[in-house]
């Protein structure tokens, strides 16, 4: 609007509009609304009517901002999300006392006028012309219009529009009043009185700060009850707040609110809504507040599910069905009144949270991260998600770096995670699946002797060649076992055996298998993504031993495929979404699909069940049939894993440095404390968690045995030579992604392209299993 300094007309216009307002008594506004029996006498009045008639006659009413609620699978609440804390309810769920109190104090002639109360306008206009104080004169319908206009501006982040909707001074104030009057009449024609009253009670601000909108949210905030249960004095208090929510905030100004409440009680008595006895009893009472919080967002998530909550929020933020932009999607969550039922199992989540924090406590001086995620085979439903940090949505102070984070260690960057972690020997099942897909057997023999694999020996058909000479080693740089079966190489996680297997396969096919099983880099890029130098990590020979960086949730979903006869189901954290009207909204996610032949999946599952029988997961049994794989990168990289599954649960457990690389053989004072393998920390957590979690599920039967063709003997050791590595290209010299210490696991010293990455150690437990006991935590004193 043009300011008075730049335009001399506003003073005249203000006077004119004031005249229009006062002239309503004489019928000018009424005439403009074609109210029978009212005439127009003057040219000025005619002009006023013309201006009035030119005002907008249709009120745009959007859905009110209403809080959304996230639920666990059993219907228990995880968190609320809101821009305005509001829950809309129909009029029959609002007490009659609340309806009466509102009408008595705000518009006692509500059921008599048609949206504009000429008597009220006249009274207010005359008062305002002769007094230094002002009266409003607005009907309840006009107030509703004002709130709708402000709400619309809020939804558009239009601050000027909000101010304009509430302007009360000068020309702008009179213009607003006229606009409201015109629109109020339109509203009265559109709705009956009860509908208008219902909408009014749902849109009002009943606090100021914290924001409480609508009578249902207000009833819960101040007394922990529903709007239908509000009594006389409670209703009077709420009705009195509306005049000035900030000044009449019960939590900040109880004395002023009590005085205002009693004024409302007087109005209720005056207009016959309560008896003298009811009035006398009500004014003697206090406010008797029983404040109930409605936490907003994932920080206050229940069931220790803050990181899962944040994951679900990011699933919504990434889905265009909730809005064109991220901002639109956030608005849908905070204003849409959604009910989001998730896959989280609260009982299993509690077990996960307890076991993760027991093994590596929050604030452990080592700074080690420890995380777990569980997926249901056959559905992809995310059952539990935990890590040894407190969730925060703000910046983390340096002193709290080992205690708090806003990063979810189990997911990718797209879902507020990190860049992922090297997975070590948990990558080997992808090599094994490719081996079986190519028609080879679990009983085929491979040459596990430590040796160099020249760049020229690697096979690439259909993708870029990333090979370099490679000289992988086993745990402790020990010698290989010579000829061994693929089953034994898997059972004991022998790096050199798997290098020989990979050397016989098309590296492109290994990468394709991993991609079919849902594996991406933690950055979110596909596995065939090339960096600035053109290097593709997932095609490097060292990737056979796990130098690829991905996420625990992706690995859990991939391993679930082995338990589910080759059918892959991507992570699915949301079961159902309903809008404010109870209508179903499409749930983000893809359908499950068959990505491996059933027999191939069964072959991999069978091999992984054998790791419990004298292999790298010996001593980690959980009392039901299970398959598992340990994983350890080289100590300088510092990530250890346990991936394992039953027919009902697939769980990934990770331990490592979330901020970079760290040698976990050293404690906080730099002293060597011993080797850390996948079975040492991650394995213990997996065992403790799964042994309890499987009791919460049904159907943990054994796995179907694969076809006999996968148990036929034969095969050869494949390429390689005794020459030393050349540190060339992606293959690296002395490389590997780590191995598993069992009967010959381990890794090399480098890999990953040059001298980096790779593995120098493994996962262990060996034949006697378990990796030994350890005190909770990894740090120093």
PLM region spans:
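N-terminal type II signal-anchor transmembrane helix
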Residues: 1-69
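Extracytoplasmic/periplasmic proteins that interact with beta-lactams or build/remodel peptidoglycan
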Residues: 57-67, 72, 135-143, 148-174, ...
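Peptidoglycan glycan-strand catalytic modules in the bacterial/periplasmic cell-wall system
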Residues: 64-275, 491-495, 502-506, 518-520
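Short pre-catalytic segments that frame enzyme active sites
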Residues: 78-87, 213-218, 246-250, 330-334, ...
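Structural recognition of the beta-strand scaffold that forms the well-ordered cores
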Residues: 104, 139-146, 197-200, 229, ...
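Bacterial peptidoglycan biogenesis and beta-lactam-recognition machinery
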Residues: 104-117, 130-136, 187-193, 205-211, ...
């Amino acid at each position: 609007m043009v300011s008075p300094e730049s335009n001399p007309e506003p003073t005249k216009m203000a006077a004119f509009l004031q005249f229009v307002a006062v002239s309503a008594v004489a019928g000018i506004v009424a005439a403009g609304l074609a109210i029978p029996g009212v005439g127009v006498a003057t040219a000025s009045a005619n002009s006023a009517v013309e201006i009035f008639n030119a005002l907008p006659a249709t009120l745009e009413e959007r859905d009110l901002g209403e809080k959304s609620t996230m639920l666990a699978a059993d219907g228990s609440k995880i968190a609320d999300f809101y821009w305005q804390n509001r829950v809309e309810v129909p009029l029959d769920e609002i007490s009659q006392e609340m309806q009466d109190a509102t009408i008595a104090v705000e518009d006692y002639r509500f059921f008599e006028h048609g949206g504009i109360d000429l008597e009220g306008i006249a009274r207010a206009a005359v008062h305002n012309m002769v007094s230094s104080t002002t009266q409003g004169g607005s009907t309840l319908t006009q107030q509703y219009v004002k709130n709708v206009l402000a709400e619309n501006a809020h939804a558009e982040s239009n601050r000027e529009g909000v101010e304009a909707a509430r302007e009360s001074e000068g020309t702008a104030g009179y213009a607003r009043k006229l606009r409201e009057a015109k629109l109020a009449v339109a509203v009265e024609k559109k709705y009956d009185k009860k509908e208008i009253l219902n909408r009014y009670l749902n849109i009002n601000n009943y606090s100021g700060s914290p924001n409480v909108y609508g009578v249902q949210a207000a009833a819960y905030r101040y007394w922990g009850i529903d709007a239908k249960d509000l009594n006389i004095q409670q209703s009077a208090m709420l009705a009195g707040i509306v005049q000035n929510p900030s000044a009449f905030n019960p939590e900040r100004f109880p004395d002023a609110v009590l005085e205002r409440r009693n004024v409302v009680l007087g109005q209720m008595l005056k207009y016959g809504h309560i008896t003298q006895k009811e009035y006398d009893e009500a004014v003697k009472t206090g406010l008797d507040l029983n404040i109930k919080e409605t936490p907003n967002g994932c920080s206050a998530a229940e069931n220790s599910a803050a990181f899962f909550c944040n994951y679900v929020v990011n699933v919504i933020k990434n889905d265009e069905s909730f809005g064109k932009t991220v901002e639109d999607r956030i608005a849908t969550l905070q204003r849409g009144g959604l009910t989001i039922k998730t896959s989280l199992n609260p009982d299993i989540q509690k077990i996960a949270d307890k076991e993760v924090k027991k093994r590596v406590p929050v604030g452990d001086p080592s700074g080690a991260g420890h995380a777990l995620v569980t997926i249901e085979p056959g559905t992809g439903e995310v059952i539990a998600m935990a890590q040894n940090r407190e969730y925060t949505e703000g910046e983390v102070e340096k002193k709290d770096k080992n205690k708090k984070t806003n990063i979810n260690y189990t997911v990718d960057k797209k879902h507020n995670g990190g860049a992922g972690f090297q997975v070590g020997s948990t990558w080997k099942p992808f090599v094994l699946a490719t081996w079986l897909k190519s028609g080879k057997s679990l009983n085929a023999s491979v040459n596990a002797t430590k040796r160099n694999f020249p760049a020229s020996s690697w096979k690439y058909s259909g993708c870029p060649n990333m090979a370099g000479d490679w000289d992988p080693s086993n745990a402790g740089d020990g010698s290989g076992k010579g000829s061994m079966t693929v089953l034994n190489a898997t059972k004991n996680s022998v790096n050199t055996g798997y290098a020989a297997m990979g050397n016989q396969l098309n590296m492109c096919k290994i990468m394709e298998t991993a991609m079919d099983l849902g594996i991406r880099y933690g950055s979110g890029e596909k596995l065939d993504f090339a960096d600035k130098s053109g290097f593709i990590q997932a095609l490097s020979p060292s990737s056979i031993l796990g130098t690829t960086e991905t996420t625990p949730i992706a690995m859990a979903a991939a391993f679930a495929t082995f338990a589910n006869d080759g059918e892959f189901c991507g992570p699915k954290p949301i079961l159902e979404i309903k809008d404010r009207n109870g209508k179903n909204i499409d749930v983000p996610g893809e359908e499950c699909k068959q990505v491996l032949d059933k027999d191939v999946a069964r072959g991999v599952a069978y091999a992984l069940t054998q790791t419990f029988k004298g292999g790298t997961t010996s001593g980690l049994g959980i009392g039901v049939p299970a398959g598992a794989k340990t994983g350890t990168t080289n100590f300088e990289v510092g990530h250890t894993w346990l991936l394992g599954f039953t027919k009902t649960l697939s769980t990934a457990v990770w331990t490592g440095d979330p901020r970079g690389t760290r040698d976990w053989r050293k404690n906080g004072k730099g002293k060597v404390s011993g080797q850390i393998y996948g079975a040492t920390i991650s394995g213990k957590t997996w065992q403790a968690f799964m042994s309890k979690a499987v009791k919460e599920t049904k159907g943990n039967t054994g796995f179907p045995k694969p076809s006999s063709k996968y148990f036929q003997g034969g095969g050869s050791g494949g390429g390689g030579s005794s020459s030393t590595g050349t540190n060339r290209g992606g293959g690296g010299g002395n490389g590997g992604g780590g191995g598993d210490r069992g009967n010959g696991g381990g890794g090399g010293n480098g890999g990953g392209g040059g001298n980096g990455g790779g593995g120098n150690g493994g996962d262990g437990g060996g034949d006697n299993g378990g990796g030994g006991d350890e005190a909770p935590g990894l740090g120093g004193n």
